[in-house]
Amino acid sequence: MKTIIAEKPSVAREIARIVGATEREEGYFTGNGYNVTWAFGHLVQPALPEGYGIRGFHPENLPIIPQVFTLVPRQVKTDKGYKADAGVMKQIKVITRLFNECDKIIVATDAGREGELIFRYLYEYIGCATPFDRLWISSLTDKAIREGLKNLECGSKYDNLYYAAKARSEADWLVGINATQAITLAAGRGTYSLGRVQTPTLAMVCKRFWENKRFTPETFHQLHFGTEHKDGTVVKFDSEEKYKDKSAAEELYNKVKGTRSATLTKVVRKEKTEDTPLLYDLTTLQKDANSKHGFTAEQTLAIAQKLYEAKLITYPRTGSRYISEDVFAEIPKLLQTLKNRPVWSLYALSIKKPTRRSVDGSKVTDHHAIIITGELPKHLSNEDMTIYDMIVGRMLEAFSEKCIKDVTQVTADCCGIIFTAKGSVIKKEGWRYIYGADKKDVLLPDDWNEGDTVTVNSSSLTTGQTKPKPLHTEASLLAAMETCGKDIEDDEMRQAIKDCGIGTPATRAAIIETLFARGYVVRADKSLVPTEKGLALYYVVKEMQIADVAMTGEWEQSLAKIERGEMDDRDFRRGIEEYTSLITSELLSCQKIFGHKESECTCPKCGTGKMQFFHKVVRCDNKECGLPIFRQKAGKDLTDDEMKELITNGKTGVLKGFKSKQGKKFSAIVAFDSDFNTQFIFPK
């Protein structure tokens, strides 16, 4: 008898059908020599500190570093603390019996780091010694499952994947437990949550927020002139230089305004080739879905997982944007399946010979890029179809021809001032045919040459301002997590450094959602805005190692090395233990920042707590409320008296000393809105 374990019941049901295990029992299917059972996520996890006899938050217990981690069934929170989930215990009992009674286990959990850990933790907790093989597949179609079952791999082949997963799990426990307890002890009240990846991610959101809010725009002035060619084409030239001095710009403008001609000093024409975009991995799919359709990262992952389980796409939690040669051989057949879908048939038929930019087996690790399986979608919701069509569209783009443009740049001299004009004409649409060109052609006369004189038919002087980097969206935050905050646009360069990012494609959505759940960040349209609680925490930890984005990226790189067999997981464990001790010490030492004064001010939100006055924030002492009111507003720190007035009356009087983004001082009333966030009210 063989036992197959899947990650969730729906997958187990499909596998059971294929192997002929058609009889339903409590917690498994059976028949034809197979038992097919399932987990539902992590059934087993490392024990909380209570599992090692450590209760409560006490500085003398820190850092908590177990010599060996104890595994326990998944816990649920109750009024009396944590206890094992009854449903989990019941399923573990079923799995234990099946594992111990069978001759061979077939591991069919998701083919990735977390899927491996789900099984290995369970196997270790049970104390099982039954040999196991690995079902490693990239889609859940009947064909893929059957081929995978014919080509099972020895379970030990994935030991390094398990070591990396286990190292990640233990590192998150060590950093999360110790950092959370240390900063909570330092604060003296409430509970703050910190994490190995969560905190650097919050730091990126807060840093961008402050860069945006504290940005001082600079005014600039730019000259322009227009000329009309004999064929009727009107071309606009812009001055290369942008002038800070308005009077100097106006003086130059008057010169241009008073002249009738300009001389072309340089005409450069060249052919520009735009490579096809690479196929989607999970992160780029999430970024595009957010920027184009407003989907959250978590929403996109959930839909992609649903499409995968519906056999419509390949494994979504991939970090690769490439496919191997054997998968490429199937692409013509997959494109042919699209001829039955009117929206895509014309585009699919236009691809006579798929191009190879996304084909590189050396850049495929556990799973290749996300592609369709050839199964036809039926009864999908609008949201599900949107993600499916994005994957189809990207496949069509990736296997189309390159886009070729004729690009022209003309430089002109007018009154000693250098002006430029740029033109671009699509010569061959290639992959841009799929969605259409994103910009219209800009035509420049093709008979212009160096030394030619053009007529100045019009001139103008415009004024603009420099702009700050925008607040992070989920799309830009995912990009920053992928590259540790480095601004990299090139697809291939992003792929080259993806091991240095923070988090993994499979975990980044959950990390972002954690920031919302902790009350550190909120959504404002598409933008991510830190709350006062998030900013207050950032202020405390921003210079500490736990908020160091680059260091977190180095840990992720080490985990990738463990997975490839290039690093011993024990060396990683020693390093993370040292790091844990360091950050715990740093966080415990920040008590002075959290020093506070008691007050008799009642919390305006909950009506029961008392407000405590800290250096940078005033906060409610009711643990169920914890309302934070950040002191700094537009470059001004509110005094204790001003804060008391705000808390007591819901608003202050007119206060002076605020400074706008442009650096101008202004006066305003600070008041609460309906959610007890602060806002400015301007006196009439």
PLM regions: where:
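Intrinsically disordered, low-complexity regulatory segments
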Residues: 1-169, 173, 350, 468
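Conserved short loop/turn motifs at secondary-structure junctions
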Residues: 1-3, 110-111, 188-191, 269-278, ...
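Basic, low-complexity terminal or inter-domain segments flanking catalytic cores
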Residues: 2, 77, 81, 125, ...
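Amphipathic alpha-helical transducer elements in NTP-driven molecular machines
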Residues: 9-16, 33-36, 40, 59-62, ...
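Accessory interaction regions appended to the cores of large information-processing enzymes
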Residues: 17-23, 47, 53-55, 154, ...
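C-terminal or mid-to-C-terminal helical accessory/interaction module adjacent to the motor/catalytic core
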Residues: 87, 100-101, 142-225, 269-270
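Metal- or metallocofactor-binding catalytic centers and their adjacent structured scaffolds
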Residues: 244-280, 286
